[in-house]
């Protein structure tokens, strides 16, 4: 019984702010800038491609990650 209580206490304590570092290990004061990437791809007009996909979506999927902010 004492071992189980000790185990529960230690597991709860590990999630407390005292057990966590106050400063993240990879933190630095260096500024990071995102570079915009312009895609120069012309979409071919195929009948097999869906009409709902516009050229900017097509460009973003091919050149960079769609979640990236620099895609336009």
Swiss-Prot record:
GO terms for cellular component: extracellular space. InterPro entries: Heat-stable_enterotox_CS, Heat-stable_enterotox_STa. Residues 1-19 form the signal peptide. The keyword Methyltransferase does not apply. The keyword Disulfide bond applies. Residues 20-53 form a propeptide. It comes from the Bacteria. This is Heat-stable enterotoxin A2. The lineage of its organism: Bacteria, Pseudomonadati, Pseudomonadota, Gammaproteobacteria, Enterobacterales.
